[in-house]
């Protein structure tokens, strides 16, 4: 995978400098099956298809809707897709059981796997208890013994554990109540719990109802990402197609970075959620979700995948998440070893 990944990124970088091939000059477009979830990263696939960017590269995006990352993986043996976007845990399970590669970072989810509180929570008034994170709110005194609503073994659970760690606490120092995110919001609205671990779109609904952000994993450099995933056999056989796929992806990234404050982009993002994802969300929530998901351009991708001086940032991020889920019993020690030795990131 190291050769593939280097080839892919460098070709994408080189091709960025060349004019895109016209659809008229291309032969019959290559039908590319893409897995997508109702998540931010799928917007680029959808928007690229809407704009005809796939045709510019001689591709024909066939975007397949999956509700979860695990649903995606279960469809892979039948080759229902060969590239796409997936989540934190599925990329690890894919490396373990489905022969997948991590071929890029789709976005940074560190700002949306958040913890919210009610406006009168005393922890909001304490800032900088940990000098390593001067903007972090809360302290051991204002958090210890309190009730946290959360979804066990989720990416948000990982983020919440990092919050407690930054305050010198563990889950044993608080009361943890496990429920799904919709139940978290309903329970918190009913006055249950002191801290609510939650993610979009329930996060934004709660904020509109007056809940306050007290913590986002990015506050303590706990990075959570969504990833671009590829079927190993396909990627090894068709690196040129992977390059073209990434070129379309990077075109979308550049567009988002340039137009992030443009109301018309927010309108398109809202249309994506209502028409493709099938979720009737408020326009303001769509705008927030778009702005809360930083994306990585080619220079940033090269930087975070650079392993010339040791493990890359991507490897470090993935290892930290893997360690957490292993501690939760999601992966056995043998499975952790297999994932790390699979070469799913850089072929080592």
Predicted segments, located by residue:
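Bacterial N-terminal signal peptides that target proteins for export
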Residues: 1-9
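Sec/Tat signal peptide C-region and signal peptidase I cleavage site
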Residues: 20-25
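Short, glycine-/small- and polar/acidic-enriched structural segments
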Residues: 26-170, 175-178, 194-200, 216-217, ...
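Solvent-exposed, polar/charged alpha-helical surfaces in well-ordered, non-transmembrane soluble domains
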Residues: 43-46, 51-52, 74, 78, ...
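Long, low-complexity C-terminal extensions of enzymes
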Residues: 321-348
């Amino acid at each position: 995978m190291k050769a593939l990944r280097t080839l892919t990124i460098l070709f994408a970088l080189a091709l960025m400098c060349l004019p895109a091939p016209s659809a008229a000059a291309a032969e019959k477009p290559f039908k590319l099956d893409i897995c997508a979830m109702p998540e931010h990263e799928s917007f680029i696939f959808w928007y690229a298809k809407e704009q005809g960017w796939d045709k510019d590269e001689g591709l024909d995006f066939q975007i397949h809707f999956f509700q979860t990352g695990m649903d995606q993986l279960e469809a892979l043996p039948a080759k229902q897709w060969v590239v796409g976007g997936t989540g934190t845990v599925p990329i690890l399970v894919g490396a373990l059981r489905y022969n997948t590669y991590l071929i890029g970072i789709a976005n940074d989810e560190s700002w949306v796997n958040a913890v919210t509180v009610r406006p009168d929570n005393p922890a909001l008034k304490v800032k900088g208890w940990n000098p390593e994170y001067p903007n972090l709110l809360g302290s051991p005194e204002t958090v210890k013994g309190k009730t946290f609503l959360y979804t066990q073994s989720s990416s948000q659970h990982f983020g919440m554990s990092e919050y407690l760690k930054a305050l010198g606490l563990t889950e044993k120092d608080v009361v943890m109540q496990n429920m799904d995110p919709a139940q978290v919001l309903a329970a918190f609205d009913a006055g249950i719990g002191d801290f609510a671990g939650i993610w979009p779109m329930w996060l934004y609904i709660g904020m509109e109802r007056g809940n306050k952000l007290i913590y986002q994993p990015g506050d303590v450099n706990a990075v959570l990402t969504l990833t671009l995933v590829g079927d190993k056999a396909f990627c090894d056989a068709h690196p040129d197609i992977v390059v073209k796929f990434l070129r379309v992806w990077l075109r979308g990234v550049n567009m988002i970075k340039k137009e992030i404050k443009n109301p018309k982009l927010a309108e398109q993002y809202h249309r994506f959620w209502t028409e493709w994802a099938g979720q009737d969300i408020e326009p303001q929530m769509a705008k927030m979700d778009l702005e809360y998901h930083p994306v990585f351009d080619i220079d940033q991708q090269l930087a975070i995948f650079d392993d010339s001086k040791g493990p890359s940032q991507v490897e470090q991020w993935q290892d930290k998440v893997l360690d957490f889920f292993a501690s939760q019993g999601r992966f056995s020690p043998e499975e952790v070893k297999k994932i790390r030795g699979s070469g799913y990131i850089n072929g080592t």
